[in-house]
């Protein structure tokens, strides 16, 4: 699956010596609520309602986003162990079937005349979001998200921003 991508848009230091960094980030959309828990970071994410349905349907059909770590079910919030062999492969195939199914549902809604704010929703699990994030203090974010207990996909977002 896809890895998070980040690009520094603006990095400046005020006369008082405060550094302000703005980063454009593209990442797996289900990680957006995780990023939004960090109140010290200003965020402006792209909306599913702003993207044409056909464009998202085509992207999900041909190039779905999803997990980069196929964690094995275990107690707790962390999936440190990863599935292997045929189980991992089977999960990846099921994920692709889910993406095709979501694309079919969205296509039907779109063709029936539903607005993209409705037609695009089934696709969100299988697509990306573009977000513009700005902060003066990234320490807490990196301490939590570049940690071994962070969800792998959120770790990937933090790593892309830090690099």
Regions found by a protein language model. Name each.
Residues 1-163:
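A conserved ligand/cofactor-binding region detector
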């Amino acid at each position: 699956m896809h890895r998070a991508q980040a690009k520094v848009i603006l990095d400046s230091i005020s006369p008082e010596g405060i550094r302000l960094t703005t980063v454009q980030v593209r990442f797996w959309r289900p990680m957006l609520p995780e990023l939004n828990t960090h109140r010290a970071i200003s965020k402006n994410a792209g909306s599913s309602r702003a993207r044409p349905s056909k464009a998202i349907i085509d992207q999900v059909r041909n190039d779905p986003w999803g997990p980069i770590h196929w964690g094995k079910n275990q107690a707790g919030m962390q999936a440190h162990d990863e599935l292997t062999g045929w189980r991992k492969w089977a999960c990846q195939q099921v994920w692709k079937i889910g993406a095709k199914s979501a694309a079919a549902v969205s296509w039907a809604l779109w063709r029936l005349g539903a607005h993209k704010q409705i037609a695009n929703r089934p696709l969100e699990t299988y697509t990306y979001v573009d977000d513009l994030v700005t902060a003066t203090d990234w320490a807490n974010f990196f301490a939590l998200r570049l940690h071994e207990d962070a969800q792998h996909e959120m770790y990937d977002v933090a790593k892309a921003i830090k690099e």
